[in-house]
Amino acid sequence: MGAAVFFGCTFVAFGPAFALFLITVAGDPLRVIILVAGAFFWLVSLLLASVVWFILVHVTDRSDARLQYGLLIFGAAVSVLLQEVFRFAYYKLLKKADEGLASLSEDGRSPISIRQMAYVSGLSFGIISGVFSVINILADALGPGVVGIHGDSPYYFLTSAFLTAAIILLHTFWGVVFFDACERRRYWALGLVVGSHLLTSGLTFLNPWYEASLLPIYAVTVSMGLWAFITAGGSLRSIQRSLLCRRQEDSRVMVYSALRIPPED
């Protein structure tokens, strides 16, 4: 049962991200480099947040449970703010790299657009964030006959997996909206990205009341997904065009196959 829970939760948590990586990133070496570099930036932000939280815990009264819980909330907020600061720093770095690539190309154009960089960097932040948030839970899931931890809900592992999937997608959407806001200098959009990130992080403290945390987080995920879709230039008309193109391609394949001469026996 432990192995089934482990693999099931792993596929739920990282299935969408793995599919996005294979379809949109793995085939382009430049995107893979941006993905790895983005993960490094997120790790540095986590390291700094951990140092801040570690210092605060050791300079305060560790026997005061309420104080320590408050420090945990404060540490989560600091971590969110540092992640967004490093997202901005990564945007600046990619902007410089984009200008350098454009100057080196023959036609004066960069081989990758800012929107593509935003998507890949957001995906990198999401994947590494998901790995660090759920890896210990998945390790505990491998235990023999594990259903819950210390009498917690039997849905603990499954809800954690769905929460991780939402966080990964949110980071992807945040990256797209954040980079676009930086390009157009829309400071209100930057504020909404940071605010939604803080809200999502705060909602996780409502666990194990999963109805009060998971449902609002997925509502935020859907909202940010629609915003990122529109920001990237998507619309209902573009969806219709993509569907029509697929239908036309399918019809062409059918016509071609129908016109082929059957092989002689």
Curated annotation (Swiss-Prot):
Impact after mutating H197A: Impaired gamma-secretease assembly and reduced proteolytic activity of the gamma-secretase complex
Transmembrane domains' residue ranges: 3-23, 32-52, 69-89, 119-139, 159-179, 187-207, 214-234
Keyword Endoplasmic reticulum in record: yes
Example of a GO biological process term: Notch receptor processing
Listed GO MF terms: endopeptidase activator activity; enzyme binding; protein-macromolecule adaptor activity
Function: Non-catalytic subunit of the gamma-secretase complex, an endoprotease complex that catalyzes the intramembrane cleavage of integral membrane proteins such as Notch receptors and APP (amyloid-beta precursor protein). Required for normal gamma-secretase assembly. The gamma-secretase complex plays a role in Notch and Wnt signaling cascades and regulation of downstream processes via its role in processing key regulatory proteins, and by regulating cytosolic CTNNB1 levels.
Protein name as annotated: Gamma-secretase subunit APH-1A
Species this chain originates from: Homo sapiens (Human)
Gene: APH1A
